Amino acid sequence: KGQRLYISINGGSSWNETQPAGNNDITWQAAAASNDGKYLMAAAKDGRLYISTTSGTNWQETQPAGNADQPWQICSMSGDGKIMLAGIYGGRVYLSTNYGGSWKEAF
């Protein structure tokens, strides 16, 4: 069975489940958030990466590596959410400098 992803918009006083992949059973590997919680990123072991620019209300799948054949190991973002990093198993790291709008291989 997959895992669930939860977000808090009040400093952890309460939590709500969010479903980036709909009702699919996903094993989540990593997650990141901007300081204000508006920008979110969730990395799945099955090779999918999701971004929200609406505090988790809506999610969009993105493929920085061009395909979903490698599991994501780590993701991170700057405090304002503009700069995002995502790394896949095997050592490649991808960078976005426009809130996840486009990606390039960083190293």
Tell me the role of every PLM-derived stretch.
Residues 3-7, 47-51, 91-95:
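A short loop-to-beta-strand structural motif that recurs across blades of beta-propeller domains
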Residues 8-9, 34, 52-53, 78, ...:
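Conserved Ser/Thr-centered positions that define the repeating blades of beta-propeller domains
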Residues 17-23, 61-67, 105-107:
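Short loop/turn motifs that cap or connect beta-strands within the blades
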Residues 27, 71:
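Beta-rich catalytic cores
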